[in-house]
Amino acid sequence: MHIPDGILPAAVCGAGYAATAPIVWYSVRKINQEANPRESIPKAAILTAAFFVVSWIHIPVPPTSVHLVLNGLLGAVLGYYAFPAILIGLFFQAVMFQHGGLTTLGVNAIVMGVPALIAYHIFRLRNIRREAGRITTGIFGFLAGSCAIGLSAGLFLVILVSFIGPGFDVEVERAAIYTLAVAHV
């Protein structure tokens, strides 16, 4: 679910960067408000590396293949560290593997990072009860992960269908996008 360079108009790519900047700022602000903000940096670094590496594990799902995303896991485990971690992972995926692109990095960060933050808040709901047992934690972990993937696929679909460039056969592209979105969900 990486949007490559050249698919979206320049204005949409710019809007993606403009929307990413305040989310990164807010995430870093929330991180700095923690009692010891440096304590979770090693955990964030390891999960950022895992997010980067698992993009090489492809699972064939006709008519395409999918790879592990881990944005729900990053959101549940890292909290506000998840958005900067995903942004860094997407940057290295774009530079080294050509998954996505540098012009669409902001849009791809929104597509993957915002659902991770939502997954974090879903996973925190397990603490409503006094004692979150293993079953409760498992249920909320599943909900967080599946909501993150579903929201990412939904954002991907909405952005591509709404803002596809004029140089494409729009009807064929939309049919392909709908098919691939269903395959991802």
Show the residue positions of the predicted features:
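Cytoplasmic-side transmembrane-helix entry/capping segments in multi-pass membrane proteins
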Residues: 37-46, 69-70, 84-87, 106-113, ...
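Alpha-helix C-terminal capping segments
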Residues: 74-81
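Small-polar-interrupted transmembrane alpha-helices in polytopic inner-membrane proteins
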Residues: 48-52, 82-95
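Hydrophobic transmembrane alpha-helices
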Residues: 2-73
